């Protein structure tokens, strides 16, 4: 049931894996405490940083330092559980053991992880929540320069840095490749996204054409 609910909330799957200059697409996931985290709600923030859950103390320390420095400047931080396991209590204990206090997005179906192009366990992403444009993808240790540029209002091409961390195992690639827009995606958008992504809605853009949906 959790995987089905997660799938229903991920309208952004229509975008596929993002490239430089492309929008990430809006999405929503349930976090490890059972709360829905809808990315459109953060469009008043300066930036959003998402990093997969990690057992690396160094990566956790880097993320914590960034949070302590930039959260007060309007940067929202999330951890992402890319289908590693669905036990929320275990996730909570693992996060606490790393000294982190962040919402963990439970991507049981791995759709958001795929859509963001995250393929390694230390591969963080940075995006502009007002435009949903991806600005950085790579190790969390190398993200700060891009974050500073984003906060300064600089315009730049997406920065992509290679990762040497363990790869994320994707169990559902074949199933996701066979998704139908008409049968699988359009009903999700109509039920979960259209009320916000419309003229006058709270989302940053209206889903009123095939281009904006993609």
Residue ranges with predicted function:
Residues 135-141, 201-214:
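Gly/Gly-Pro-rich "capping" loops immediately C-terminal to redox-active cysteine motifs
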Residues 170-187:
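Electrostatic cytochrome c docking/interface patches
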Residues 41-59, 186:
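Short active-site neighborhood of thiol/selenol oxidoreductases, capturing the structured segment around
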Residues 58-98, 108-114:
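Structural microenvironment flanking redox-active thiols in thiol-disulfide oxidoreductases
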Residues 124, 189-200:
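The canonical Cys-X-X-Cys-His
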Residues 18-40, 58, 182:
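N-terminal "domain-start" segment that seeds a small globular fold
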Residues 25, 94-128, 134:
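Short, internal strand/loop/helix patches
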Residues 129-151:
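Non-catalytic, surface beta->alpha helical segment in thiol-disulfide oxidoreductase systems
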């Amino acid at each position: 049931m959790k995987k089905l609910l997660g799938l229903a909330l991920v309208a952004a799957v229509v975008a596929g894996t993002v490239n430089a200059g492309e929008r990430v697409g809006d999405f929503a996931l349930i976090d490890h405490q059972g709360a829905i985290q809808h990315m459109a709600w953060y469009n008043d923030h300066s930036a959003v940083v998402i990093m997969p859950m990690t057992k690396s103390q160094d990566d956790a320390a880097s993320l914590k330092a960034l949070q302590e420095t930039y959260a007060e400047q309007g940067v929202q931080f999330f951890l992402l559980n890319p289908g590693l396991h669905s036990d929320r209590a275990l996730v909570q204990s693992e996060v606490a053991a790393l000294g982190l206090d962040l919402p963990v997005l439970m991507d049981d179906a791995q759709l958001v992880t795929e859509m963001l192009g995250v393929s390694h366990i230390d591969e963080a992403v940075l995006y502009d929540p007002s435009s949903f444009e991806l600005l950085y993808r790579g190790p969390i240790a190398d993200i700060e320069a891009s974050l500073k540029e984003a906060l300064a209002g600089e315009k730049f091409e997406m920065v992509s840095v290679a990762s040497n961390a363990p790869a994320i195992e994707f169990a559902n690639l074949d199933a996701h490749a066979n998704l139908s827009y008409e049968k699988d995606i359009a009903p999700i958008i109509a039920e979960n996204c259209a009320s916000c992504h419309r003229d006058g809605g709270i989302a940053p853009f209206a889903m009123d054409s095939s281009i904006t949906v993609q």
